[in-house]
């Protein structure tokens, strides 16, 4: 991944700083030297690195810093804030709204990934309830319309283009007018890739802009082009005056610092980042979340948004859990949900501390193992799917049949059944009349408020089930009754039986953040 090496080096510099017994001028200078060297070797502009160093030094007065961990935290916070400022021009980007047509024009260099990103962006807005569409106004590159057409069909997004018309201004105007009449919310116009030396194409870009009058112009910036990104971005800014940037190809191995320099030089916000070639590989950009992931501190907000965008079907499982049941079918549904989340390394980078633990782990191996588990459960009968796995314990011949039918080993089938059995036992302790939820009357928040003594009993049961280890960053001592009550309500989606529509992820996130200590760097 782009910036992976930068993240490791920044982590290492902050880790060495944290190990020191006391904070002094020499220690701070060493930290800043290591950080600046890492940024320079990633192609970040020298002027920006000098500004970052100067700003950190202004914020830190070593002579007045408290000794020990508090002094270190002040220095670490200053570093974190300045790294955020590096990628945050503090300019609000345009946001499309439902019921009002918004025209977005995409510009950028040839080969930067504009056409693919157009489809990703249309799908992103469509999933959030906005009617999205695409206009293919790239008549310069052979096959551009065909590529956009294929991507649009895959994303199930309406599109407009022409095989006969060669004037991109005419195509763009006709497409935008058509979709405005059809009351679309987001109209994304794909234009030809162009270089700053190609004055004719730059003039064409201005003509298209004058014809369609976009609400927002977005520049697609390839993370791999290095220090040339700054000069190219300035040329586009002067001509098209783009209001936002999408950085693509962040799944590669280029340095990527040039793209960050371009953002700082043009004072334009990054709105999204492309993390892969697939249609779902587009992430909303948040400066603090980006730097947090870079330093190995995770991005819970991004994780929750990603989970919510996938629209998991949880109704059947929630209903079964309330009754104290967990079936093989529930297990299969959850496997499918996990695979929708994407590569394990991507998820790990969003969870504090997990990115370091994932070093050396192979995404392909993890994905293959989950696929083989799906093969196993897909080879079962309806009766077996609706069981809690006990059927296989009572009739071992079923294990051999499923192994043969799925092309897996008997051991793999037994391991899968064992996992289902573990979840089934947990479900019994959680649901039903005699379970945790049953004793809380189906509404955890209300029951705990009525009788706080049940909180202690619930904690003991969860510890006995191996669920009392806590979450990284949570301070159990700081959790009060109000925190537990709110979280319990969120876990049930805001209600008891009949009203449980799934977890309130954003609410849970806010509650976790309120209870978190400042993260420790080791």
Swiss-Prot record:
Keyword Transport annotated: no
Location within or outside the cell: Cytoplasm; Endoplasmic reticulum
CDD domains reported in the protein's UniProt record: SRP54_G (cd17875)
EC primary class: hydrolase
Domain of life where this protein originates: Eukaryota
PROSITE patterns referenced in this protein's UniProt entry, alphabetically: SRP54 (PS00300)
Enzyme Commission number(s) from the entry: 3.6.5.4
Signal peptide (UniProt feature, chain positions): none
UniProt-reported outcome of changing residue 194 to L/H: Cold-sensitive
Disulfide topology: none
Binding site for GTP: 108-115, 190-194, 248-251
InterPro entries attached to this UniProt entry: AAA+_ATPase (IPR003593), P-loop_NTPase (IPR027417), Signal_recog_part_SRP54_M_sf (IPR036891), Signal_recog_particl_SRP54_hlx (IPR013822), Signal_recog_particle_SRP54_M (IPR004125), SRP54 (IPR022941), SRP54_euk (IPR006325), SRP54_GTPase_dom (IPR000897)
UniProt keyword Cell cycle, yes or no: no
Any Gene Ontology biological process: SRP-dependent cotranslational protein targeting to membrane, translocation
Keywords: Cytoplasm, Endoplasmic reticulum, GTP-binding, Hydrolase, Nucleotide-binding, Ribonucleoprotein, RNA-binding, Signal recognition particle
Region named G-domain: 1-295
Region (M-domain), start-end ranges: 296-522
NCBIfam families in UniProt: SRP54_euk
Subunit structure of this chain's protein: Fungal signal recognition particle consists of a 7S RNA molecule (scR1) and at least six protein subunits: srp72, srp68, srp54, sec65, srp21 and srp14. Interacts with srp101.
Domain-level remarks: The NG domain, also named G domain, is a special guanosine triphosphatase (GTPase) domain, which binds GTP and forms a guanosine 5'-triphosphate (GTP)-dependent complex with a homologous NG domain in the SRP receptor subunit srp101. The two NG domains undergo cooperative rearrangements upon their assembly, which culminate in the reciprocal activation of the GTPase activity of one another. SRP receptor compaction upon binding with cargo-loaded SRP and GTPase rearrangement drive SRP-mediated cotranslational protein translocation into the ER.
Role: Signal-recognition-particle (SRP) assembly has a crucial role in targeting secretory proteins to the rough endoplasmic reticulum (ER) membrane. SRP is required for the cotranslational protein translocation for ER import and preferentially recognizes strongly hydrophobic signal sequences. It is involved in targeting the nascent chain-ribosome (RNC) complex to the ER and is proposed to participate in the arrest of nascent chain elongation during membrane targeting. srp54 binds to the signal sequence of presecretory protein when they emerge from the ribosomes.
Family: Belongs to the GTP-binding SRP family. SRP54 subfamily.
Record protein name field: Signal recognition particle subunit SRP54
Originating species: Schizosaccharomyces pombe (strain 972 / ATCC 24843)
